[in-house]
Amino acid sequence: MKQKGKMSGKKLKQMFVTYTFVLPDFIGLLVFIIIPIIYSFYMSLYDWNFANIKQFIGIQNYVTMFSDSEWWQSLGRTFKLTLLYVPALFILSILFAVLINYVKNEKAAGFVKTAFLLPYSITSVIASCLWMFLYMDRSGFINVFLKAFGLKGEKFLGSTSQAMVCIAVVLIWINLGYNIILFLSAIKDIPYSYYEAAKLDGANSWQTFWKITFPLLKPTSVFVLITSVIASFQCLDLIMVMTGGG
């Protein structure tokens, strides 16, 4: 009986420690995600005016939204941006992570990682302003560069298709470094014995990547894909600054 009591007490202590570590993340999730979502849904059921007078209208706001053709057009453009941005970011992130992993000089590897991660530390609005100077019709750096070689300048933000590509480039520039760090950490966690066994079996670098590295990156890949899709739906500030919402 004493042994059983000790075991149950030990188990309770382990559970307490576990929940103590989880509690801060749960509080953050509750305060910054769950409660705002619930409150936003509550607000969507009312008609609000500037006098802060509300009138309950049920799901009328959702009916209005789904019957608006502009909303469907905006949603379609968002999906196009997602299909353009997410695969490109995913491929580039893995590619650069693998290449950096081959760099033996720690200082050089650290410099490269810092250079890639730096854009992630600035806000989307600042990043948008920086890239707007590059995309400007006449004095933008890209057009100046093109004209220096006798090429015709482009109105990069002047059409929907070109603007979408430009926005995707900015999103990739911002988030590439963060995803590289994630993939690089996952690659370094792969036991080196796997690669030694593959080398003994005569596998080349391409076969090693497809048979060992890429499959073992699945958890990180899923996380990166999910966060990338979310990011493509949360870039309104970037779009408003660069295109004015058009």
Where are these regions (language model features)?
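Short, Lys/Arg-rich, polar N-terminal cytosolic tail immediately upstream
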Residues: 1-13
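A structural signal for multi-pass alpha-helical bundles of membrane permease subunits
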Residues: 10-246
